[in-house]
């Protein structure tokens, strides 16, 4: 059974001042994440600015992070695309490179019907039958909701082992949990819904906030799993202002700004994303300071 772990960080992609990928910083950041609560890392997902990376950059980044982590965490490649052919090729490459799995976003912009979504993921699963795959449902970005009945059909493929459920619907996650075996893992796609999702049968989170508070998120999940719901709730409430602050504008703008405030040289997002505004930076400073996450 594939286990990607409870806390998976959707890692940012650091850039140099001239906009090239800072592979050395990526390696250091990956090591830092694994030492601070991350069981797995998604490389080149939404938070990693995959739409503005070339496939060549992505493949090099996969290898950089894989080598840096050296088996201490699961490395999951963001290989989704709104072109089925491209998604198959990229996922096959990730498998060839020896990564631990792939995160496959629902095809965006072209808005396939449910049967098209089924055929898309089916084709990828058949192309890499021994490679673990995590579906990624985020209708707010893709324009299309991967419905539970489609996920249930796809889960019949043994290498489709999990879903990052970022629809924001606990009812949708509950429907999946009721219909699928516990070996099919449901991950929160929003930090603020990690604890609520656990309550309806979720397994963990693909997190942005874990760049900053991975150990606390891990502690929250473990408290819930061990039956200490009061402790889990207390941690959730303590971290909620951070969870919300990291999404006051488009991800990954706030998390990159927060990491910069902590001293990481992660650079600015690539266009069409922009730098954090003064107002966003001010809000982040206040929240980070309240949680003791800024160096004095």
UniProtKB/Swiss-Prot annotation:
Record-linked InterPro entries: Aldolase_TIM, DapA, DapA-like, Schiff_base-form_aldolases_AS, Schiff_base-form_aldolases_CS
Alphabetic keyword roster: Amino-acid biosynthesis, Cytoplasm, Diaminopimelate biosynthesis, Lyase, Lysine biosynthesis, Schiff base
Pathway: Amino-acid biosynthesis; L-lysine biosynthesis via DAP pathway; (S)-tetrahydrodipicolinate from L-aspartate: step 3/4
Subcellular location per the Swiss-Prot or TrEMBL entry: Cytoplasm
CDD domains (UniProt xref): DHDPS (cd00950)
Substrates-to-products reaction catalysed: L-aspartate 4-semialdehyde + pyruvate = (2S,4S)-4-hydroxy-2,3,4,5-tetrahydrodipicolinate + H2O + H(+)
One cellular component term from this protein's GO annotations in UniProt: cytosol
Keyword Plastid carried by entry: no
Domain of life: Bacteria
Any Gene Ontology biological process: lysine biosynthetic process via diaminopimelate
Residues at the site labelled Part of a proton relay during catalysis: 46, 109
EC number(s) from the headed UniProt entry: 4.3.3.7
Signal peptide annotation: none
Family matches, as Gene3D superfamilies: Aldolase class I
NCBIfam families: dapA
Its biological purpose: Catalyzes the condensation of (S)-aspartate-beta-semialdehyde [(S)-ASA] and pyruvate to 4-hydroxy-tetrahydrodipicolinate (HTPA).
Family affiliation: Belongs to the DapA family.
Quaternary structure note: Homotetramer; dimer of dimers.
Name this protein carries in UniProt: 4-hydroxy-tetrahydrodipicolinate synthase
Source organism per UniProt: Thermosynechococcus vestitus (strain NIES-2133 / IAM M-273 / BP-1)
Lineage: Bacteria, Bacillati, Cyanobacteriota, Cyanophyceae, Acaryochloridales
Gene of this entry: dapA
